[in-house]
UniProtKB/Swiss-Prot annotation:
Pfam families: CinA (PF02464), CinA_KH (PF18146), MoCF_biosynth (PF00994)
NCBIfam families: cinA_nterm (TIGR00200), PncC_domain (TIGR00199), PRK00549.1 (NF001813)
Protein family according to the UniProt entry: Belongs to the CinA family.
InterPro entries assigned: CinA, CinA-like_C, CinA_C, CinA_KH, Competence-induced_CinA, MoaB/Mog-like_dom_sf, MoaB/Mog_dom
Name this polypeptide is given: CinA-like protein
CDD domains membership: cinA
Gene3D superfamilies, alphabetized: 3.30.70.2860, CinA-like, MoaB/Mog-like domain
Length: 414
């Protein structure tokens, strides 16, 4: 059984308002074993909304319309869904009385346009809104021998969440066959999206009862696994079995099998090994320290960090010899190593990290272009240093650099 979510409001098609309701309802539906197959955002047009509603009702068993139930002329969800269903709106006298009562309790005269909130699609069940003036509606029907469950929900998140949790969730759950969804997320570093897919596709395509989605961002690839079954044990067993096979194939490139971030994993290993870490950063400007300290409890292992942006600070705070900078340049393998080793010694930490590079958009040369970064990680056994040439803008280069640094630390610890 699949669901479709339709978010309504022209403001959601601008950069100024985000649709957070869809994320919330997707999570709640997944908990019930329902897959959300489609999401739509529609502006305040009766014709456009009616067209989207017809398509949604034709292809999805469960359709949730969010927003457009207010009193103003651009609140058109009731009318558009009625158009799509070929039904009429009827003004409900009980809702009219409730509206008058609500406004009277506030000693406010009710505007005439609020009466529109008492209009109900023929045959719909009214869903009381305890947190606002716009009631929801529920319509149960059938199309081509398949059930249809249609909800009209208010747009304000606090109203929608309360209405769903207290009323709609139970209404839908009582009508659904029992199903459970289990999920796992594997997070991978050091490998690109196409490389990961080439290696794991022969494995995950064998699992017809598990949906696998691959997502990529700078320095990381995620495999999202989802299985639906009659019992939670069956669903969990399916994703666990596939996750184990994928982890065997990708080996230490997998840094998390339950969705933890790279900085969380590094923190876990540092605590497990009673280790500490300090960082001396140039081009990342403190981003690595920020990511490490975003983890709760990081004070147990994070000693400190410095942003040594200028050559003077590299010497003053991390003991990088001026002659080394003059001979090799501030962006060099030698300086990255000196930052890591010297700051580790200064802070008496078990691991030191040094990063130097050119984040751009200016400052690059033919020999040392924008995106060139040197990253060094030092411990008592020695120092690893890498040269990377990252693509993208300043923000992307800084993120890539911090991601590679964290992964180098992780591999030192495992």
């Amino acid at each position: 059984m699949i669901a479709e979510i339709v978010a309504i409001g022209s403001e959601l098609l601008t950069p100024f308002r985000q649709d957070t309701n869809s994320l919330y309802l997707t999570q709640r539906l997944n908990e019930m074993g329902v897959e959300v197959a489609f999401k739509n955002i529609v502006g305040d047009s009766r014709a456009n909304l009616a067209s989207v509603a017809r398509t949604a009702i034709a292809r999805s068993h469960i359709v949730l319309f969010m927003g457009g139930l207010g009193p103003t002329e651009d609140d058109l969800t009731r009318e558009a869904v009625a158009d799509a269903l070929g039904l009429r709106l009827k003004r409900n006298p009980d809702l009219v009385a409730e509206l008058y009562k609500r406004f009277a309790s506030r000693r406010v005269t009710m505007p005439d346009n609020n009466m529109r909130q008492a209009d109900v699609i023929a045959g719909a069940e009214i869903i009381q809104n305890d947190n606002g003036s716009a009631p929801g509606q529920f319509i149960e029907g059938e199309q081509d021998g398949q059930p249809r469950y249609i909800f009209l929900l208010p747009g304000p998140p606090h109203e929608l969440k309360a209405m769903w949790n207290e009323k709609c969730h139970h209404t839908l759950r009582d009508r659904l066959p029992r199903a459970y969804i289990a999920t796992r997320e594997l997070r991978i570093s050091s490998l690109g999206e196409s490389t990961v897919d080439a290696r794991v596709a022969p494995i995950y395509t064998k699992y017809k009862n598990v949906d696998t989605t691959i997502l990529a961002k700078p320095g990381e690839v995620s495999l999202h696994l989802k299985s639906r079954a009659a019992t939670m044990e069956q669903a969990q067993a399916a994703v666990d079995q596939l996750a184990a096979e994928l982890e065997d194939e990708l080996d230490d490139a997998v840094f998390s099998t339950n969705g933890e971030s790279l900085e969380q994993i590094v923190g876990y290993y540092l605590q497990m090994r009673s280790g500490t870490i300090s960082v001396a950063e140039s081009c990342t400007g403190g981003l690595l320290a920020e990511r490490l300290t975003n983890v709760s409890g990081s004070s147990r292992y994070f000693i400190g960090g410095v942003v040594v942006y200028s050559n003077q600070m590299k010497t003053l705070l991390a003991d990088v010899p001026p002659l080394m900078i003059e001979e090799h340049g501030a962006v060099s393998r030698q300086v990255a190593v000196a930052l890591a080793e010297n700051f580790r010694e200064i802070t008496n930490s078990t691991i030191g990290v040094g990063i130097t590079g050119i984040a751009g958009p200016t400052g690059g040369t033919e020999d040392k272009p924008v995106g060139l970064v040197y990253i060094a990680v030092a411990d008592e056994l020695g120092t690893d240093v890498v040269e990377r040439r990252f693509p993208g803008d300043r923000e992307r280069i800084r993120w890539w650099s911090s991601q590679v640094a964290l992964d180098m630390v992780r591999k030192k610890l495992i």
